[in-house]
């Protein structure tokens, strides 16, 4: 009995329309595209959509800095984004914008239903206000000194040095990041979405299979701490949709951003005329809805979004597929090192299929981070795609074209071996379907090794020189071409450009259901180079170009310029600080935090536990173990969400991945005082 085709709607998280797409973004779009292409190969009806997230204060301010209207900026950015995604062969059916008529109508509809159902609450709040710009300031547009560790130049929501979270009103000496003015407190009435009203529904949905176990466990922490009402409005000036019947109030960007999924699909429905919007978004929809997202936006997609849909009588997602971050060469992407690589820059130097393959080989259904090690990237692509797969075709095609007029043999040389290859279709399909592309790639490459071993053992280059063995040569090389065809069919979701060239060479379409029947008596075309080996020099040029792309303007920079020396203190004040040499006995990740490491320090007879916001700079915490450092030993213990921190390690640098732990000279011992 034939399997009934599924109707599936797939989305990727909406890129923010104030910057270029980079290789971190591309992980998600490539992962989703591989899954979509596989589903289409299996006969399912898939609609794949995305859009630019085009609202919010950052876009409004950046457009002002550029001297243009926000509408012009987001239009130009949308064109750039779509060009980048096309360059990576991301097969979107529609790419739209949240700044659209469809999104405005749907946002107003959902808000109206939530309000009518009693889920919108009004409350007066106090906010920081920029008196020079005449605007309320979002958390990230306020900077000041951390109220916990006293680190300067920290954002209004959390400290990148000690990891503390707080409200912008707690900052010491806060300044507007927009004008530099000292903000003042002002009151404003805001509208809130009553998220706690959906707690029971969300807890049931969490454990329904809609989320990966890691995500469901994280959500349980949020439930345990209690859900809070969500502020869904912002005050003018703001670039976005004005709230109906509330002049001067605008929907917060995170309200209309996920509704952008619906708006993009509605736009596709209107374009085509053969799609039913309600079939995919109606309360009782039987179709499948999947969101591919990064772990940084799980909170919005696993709490607010399903609650908004439930409260406005729309369906909830079938699944959220969450992935981790991308690091490059074991560290956070860096503009100064040239590893913050834009998608457009990559495409100037390298084939998109190379990155698609490398990401596919590393991806799984878990939310682990993926490291793009550039040397390994070159070696793996060259070894797997060029040496194992494409080489299989080139080793056999020449003989078929020259000796047999491009026609394959009428029979298979080794039907048993061929069946081994086609039998693997089930397990490879399961891996793709479960988003275990790394597992699929490993199985495909194992088959490629078998195919090349067959050719090595049969040695067609030797047989070709032996008189009277034309039939053997024909059979061997035809077998090699047929094995190549099976491998490329399995790789089709990953390598669309190579697939297109392969189909032209084999003179046939690669389909999952056709591999059971080998190509017998079939004519192929003249072989042309299908794939070029990656040149490490090209990778180095790409990195160098990324440094130039991200180079700052002519402003003078440096440690003192970026972080001026603070006010003079007395010697007595300094003498109160007790700094000691410490041995890092153990370093480990802190579950639930993307910024902190937990350090166990030995002070020569005393052990301390410290939480330090250095994870981005030290992605492999084990590398710190056994190292000497300097700590503030008499800092009052501070209770954090993850435990008690008993001091502070000393480090230099601006923050993020550019943090450098201090180390003493040789001879210093744990417990020694730094004087």
Swiss-Prot record:
What terms describe the molecular function in GO for this protein? ATP binding; metal ion binding; methionine-tRNA ligase activity; tRNA binding
Motif 'KMSKS' region positions after renumbering to this chain: 332-336
**Location in the cell:** Cytoplasm
Residues bound to ATP are: 335
Q: What is its EC number?
A: 6.1.1.10
User: What Gene3D superfamilies does the record point to?
Assistant: HUPs, Isoleucyl-tRNA Synthetase, Domain 1, Methionyl-tRNA synthetase, Zn-domain, Nucleic acid-binding proteins
Any one of the GO BP annotations: methionyl-tRNA aminoacylation
* Family in the record: Belongs to the class-I aminoacyl-tRNA synthetase family. MetG type 1 subfamily.
What this chain does, per the entry, is described as: Is required not only for elongation of protein synthesis but also for the initiation of all mRNA translation through initiator tRNA(fMet) aminoacylation.
Please describe the quaternary structure of this protein.
Homodimer.
Q: What name does this protein carry?
A: Methionine--tRNA ligase
Species assigned in the record = Yersinia pseudotuberculosis serotype IB (strain PB1/+)
Please name the taxonomic classification of the source: Bacteria, Pseudomonadati, Pseudomonadota, Gammaproteobacteria, Enterobacterales
Q: Which gene encodes it?
A: metG
């Amino acid at each position: 009995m034939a399997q009934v085709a599924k109707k599936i709607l797939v989305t990727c998280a909406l890129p923010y329309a104030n910057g270029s797409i980079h290789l971190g973004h591309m992980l998600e779009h490539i992962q989703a595209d591989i899954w979509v292409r596989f589903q289409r190969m299996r006969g399912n009806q898939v609609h794949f959509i995305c859009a630019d997230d085009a609202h919010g204060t950052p876009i409004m301010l950046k457009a002002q800095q550029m001297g243009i209207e926000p509408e012009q900026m987001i239009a130009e950015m949308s064109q750039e984004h779509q060009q980048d995604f096309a360059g990576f062969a991301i097969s979107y059916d529609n790419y739209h914008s949240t700044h659209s008529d469809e999104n405005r109508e749907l946002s107003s509809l959902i808000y109206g239903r939530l309000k009518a159902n009693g889920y919108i609450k009004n409350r007066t709040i106090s906010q920081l206000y920029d008196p020079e710009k005449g605007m309320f300031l979002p958390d990230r547009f306020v900077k000041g000194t951390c109220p916990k560790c006293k680190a300067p130049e920290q954002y209004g929501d959390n400290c990148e040095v000690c990891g503390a979270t707080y409200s912008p009103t707690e900052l010491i000496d806060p300044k507007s990041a927009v004008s530099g003015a000292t903000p003042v407190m002002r009151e404003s009435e805001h509208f809130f979405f009553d998220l706690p009203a959906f707690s029971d529904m969300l807890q049931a949905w969490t454990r329904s299979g809609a989320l990966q176990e890691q995500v469901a466990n994280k959500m349980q922490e949020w439930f345990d701490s209690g859900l809070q009402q969500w502020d869904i409005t912002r005050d003018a000036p703001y670039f976005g949709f004005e709230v109906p019947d509330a002049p001067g109030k605008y929907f917060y960007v995170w309200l209309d951003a996920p509704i952008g999924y619906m708006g993009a699909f509605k736009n596709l429905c209107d374009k085509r005329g053969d799609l039913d919007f309600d079939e995919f978004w109606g309360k009782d929809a039987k179709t499948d809805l999947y969101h591919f997202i990064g772990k940084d936006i799980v909170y919005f997609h696993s709490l607010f979004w399903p609650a908004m849909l439930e409260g406005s009588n729309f369906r909830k997602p079938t699944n959220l597929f969450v992935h981790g971050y991308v690091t490059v060469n074991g560290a956070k992407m860096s503009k100064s090192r040239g590893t913050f690589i834009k998608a457009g820059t990559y495409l100037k130097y390298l084939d998109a299929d190379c990155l698609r393959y490398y990401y596919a080989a590393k991806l799984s259904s878990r939310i682990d981070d993926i490291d793009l090690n550039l040397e390994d990237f070159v070696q793996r692509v060259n070894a797997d795609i060029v040496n194992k797969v494409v080489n299989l075709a080139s080793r056999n095609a020449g003989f078929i074209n020259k000796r047999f007029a491009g026609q394959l043999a009428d029979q298979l040389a080794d039907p048993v071996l061929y069946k081994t290859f086609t039998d693997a279709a089930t397990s490879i399909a399961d891996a793709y379907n479960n988003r275990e592309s790394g597992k699929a790639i490993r199985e495909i490459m194992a088959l490629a090794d078998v195919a090349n071993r067959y050719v090595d053992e049969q040695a067609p280059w030797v047989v070709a020189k032996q008189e009277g063995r034309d039939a053997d040569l024909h059979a061997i090389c035809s077998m090699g071409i047929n094995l190549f065809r099976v491998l490329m069919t399995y790789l089709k979701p990953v390598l669309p450009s190579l697939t297109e060239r392969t189909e032209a060479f084999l003179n046939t379409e690669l389909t999952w259901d056709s591999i059971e029947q080998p190509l017998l008596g079939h004519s192929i075309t003249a072989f042309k180079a299908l794939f070029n080996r990656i040149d490490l020099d090209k990778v180095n040029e790409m990195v160098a170009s990324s440094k130039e792309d991200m180079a700052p303007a002519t402003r003078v920079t440096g440690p003192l310029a970026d972080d001026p020396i603070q006010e003079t203190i007395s010697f007595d004040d300094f003498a109160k600080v007790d700094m000691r040499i410490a041995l890092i006995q153990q370093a480990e990740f802190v579950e639930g935090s993307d910024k902190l490491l937990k350090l166990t320090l030995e002070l020569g007879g005393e052990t301390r536990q410290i939480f330090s916001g250095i994870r981005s700079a030290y992605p492999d915490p084990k590398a710190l173990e056994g190292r000497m450092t300097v700590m503030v030993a008499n800092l009052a213990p501070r209770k954090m969400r993850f435990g008690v921190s008993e001091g502070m390690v000393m480090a230099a640098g601006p923050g993020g991945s550019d943090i450098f732990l201090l180390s003493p000279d040789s001879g210093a011992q744990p417990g020694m005082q730094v004087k």
